[in-house]
């Protein structure tokens, strides 16, 4: 379902080398969510939103983040309350995971990165187009072409790219807008979380 830019591997390899000694960088994202950020086309920015739709990792950093256990944060009421207030769409997904006994690695790792002040390097223009949100598969519904119609970088080489600073607050606001959670759903999520806590007691 994923279409890759001709320069995807060039982009990933370049940035794996550039950021290898920066322990705050968890991965190099190829995919960039349609946030509507205003920045140059050759720009990079940091985000906690790891995307499994094409990414590059360092084994050392991946192992370090993987050592954090899901239960370490899920059963912390303080952490989950912060998540509910600041990033409700992540609270929604994480609660659904535990309540329904399913696992979404991308959501799990996004929370781990937020808790550890870690980020993924992400291109302004996506290097990956996901065509799987057309309602034809079993995992994703139809998003009215939002992902399948994304402009993709079709250059053969990625060239020199420049990191642009975007505040975590601004990034979170954009994602909350993209993945808006209704008030009723938020109430249902709190109820599900309480049920999960009772189950574990």
Name every feature range the model reports, one short phrase each.
Residues 2-201:
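Peripheral/terminal regions associated with large enzymatic or DNA-binding modules
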């Amino acid at each position: 379902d994923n279409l890759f830019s001709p320069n995807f591997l060039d982009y990933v390899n370049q940035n794996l080398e550039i950021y290898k000694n920066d322990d705050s960088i968890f991965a190099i994202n190829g995919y960039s969510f349609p946030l509507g950020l205003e920045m140059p086309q050759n720009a990079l920015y940091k985000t906690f939103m790891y995307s499994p739709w094409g990414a590059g990792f360092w084994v050392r950093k991946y192992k370090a983040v993987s050592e954090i256990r899901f239960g370490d944060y899920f059963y912390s009421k303080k952490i989950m309350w912060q998540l509910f207030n600041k990033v409700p769409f992540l609270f929604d997904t994480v609660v659904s995971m535990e309540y329904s006994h399913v696992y979404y690695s991308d959501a799990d790792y996004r929370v781990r990165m937020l808790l550890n002040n870690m980020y993924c390097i992400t291109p302004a223009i996506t290097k990956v187009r996901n065509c799987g949100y057309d309602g034809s598969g079993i995992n994703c519904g139809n998003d009215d072409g939002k992902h399948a119609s994304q402009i993709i970088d079709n250059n053969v080489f990625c060239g020199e790219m420049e990191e642009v600073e975007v505040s975590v607050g601004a990034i979170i606001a954009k994602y909350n807008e993209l993945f808006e959670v209704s008030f009723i759903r938020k109430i249902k999520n709190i109820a599900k979380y309480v049920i999960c806590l009772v189950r574990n007691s």
